[in-house]
Amino acid sequence: YMRIAPELYLKRLIVGGMERVYELGRVFRNEGIDIKHNPEFTMVEIYQAYADYNDLMHLTETIVSQTAQKVLGTMKITYEGQEIDLTPPWNRMTMIEAVAKYTGQDFSGIKDLGEARKMADAINVPYEKTFGIGKIINACFEEHVEEKLIQPTFITGHPKEISPLAKSSEADPEITDRFEGFIYAREICNGFSELNDPIDQRERFQKQEEDRAA
């Protein structure tokens, strides 16, 4: 009864013909507690038919900025002594661009796992032996980039390896149409164009099981 997300019920409504649905409610995660995570929290989850991740980024920055304007009378707020400007449009960077900007390691075009490991080693990022290139890029991002995203920023272009439910990019099948929003080094949202290819989805789930077994 303690759900981790309202996802399945909202998706059933989309399939049933309701083109825009959302729920604001409590969710529960059987995970540890730290400054960024709590096992019980309030979340809004949104699904929209005939839209993609670009539409959802626009919706997200509009909701956050307009909420601040309505409640506080301004889109500029101060948190922990730092001024945060919520005015749209927010900054946008791909994960690879962000890693390159803040670490100097550019994973663009890297296809060799050994080379990716060397690049992670160069900036002292730990990784497991089962990690593919996508997970290594994400590890570099989490280790060195997240803490630097103070102003509202959307990170896009997540590797397929860490995004099993997101649709692949038409430009690069190893990258997905996904975004995460960050404010003051905190992830405030996660969204993507939903994968609707059942064959691709099954293959990704099978790959996940193989990785767990390894």
Predicted regions: what is each one?
Residues 1-214:
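Class II aminoacyl-tRNA synthetase catalytic cores and aaRS-like
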